Amino acid sequence: MKKTMRLIALLVFLAVSRQTSAQEKIRVGQGSISLQSGLMYIGKDRGLFAKYGLTTEVIYIPGGSTNVQVLVSGNLDLSQLSGAPGVAANLEGADLIYFVGLLDKLNYQLITRPEIKSIEQLKGKKFGVSRFGSSADFGMRAMLKLVGVDPVKEATILQIGDEPARIAAIKSANIDGTVANAPFGTEAERLNSILSPTPSKWIFHFSTPDC
């Protein structure tokens, strides 16, 4: 009998908790336009958040580092981010928690202006990222180092904005290259902006215990 009453009490508690949480609105940050970043919108449109009693507002804020700033300020309840911005913020005293991981690889592609035909031509060029400290910034610098280009001494890194803005900056010759997720790599191929080297050579694991 006691076990039955405990079970009933637990079910009542869960029901009340769900009703209470249904009245709560959460603000979710979204930092990029990419295939994996669409999960927040899918969750909202398919009613997955509502299923668990959450009313969700998805807010697009370009750049992971900018998302972190808004998150730390308390104006977001959670955000979909890559690893670099949150880790950097925690090293500076923030108390952010990552509770799920979508990717264990850096899946950016390097997109350059069509006239760049070799890795050697990357030296001395201008490259665009979303914001300093973002995953795009981390990925851009990591890729340059991977091919022997010092991102500090042999390249210029500029804050441009989100991926559509960076592709536009390549078209207008304001920058020479950038990193981008799908589907922007496919778009760049149609525009005759090369991916150098082939995308598969750029895919490497983040340094995490699960990788």
Which residues make up each language-model segment?
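Intrinsically disordered/low-complexity terminal segments and short unstructured peptides
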Residues: 3-4, 19, 55
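Sec-dependent signal peptide recognition
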Residues: 2-10
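Absolute protein N-terminus
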Residues: 1, 22-24
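Short, glycine-/small- and polar/acidic-enriched structural segments
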Residues: 24-152, 156-162, 166-172, 176-187, ...
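Extracellular/periplasmic periplasmic-binding protein-like sensory domains
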Residues: 205-211
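Sec/Tat signal peptide C-region and signal peptidase I cleavage site
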Residues: 16-22
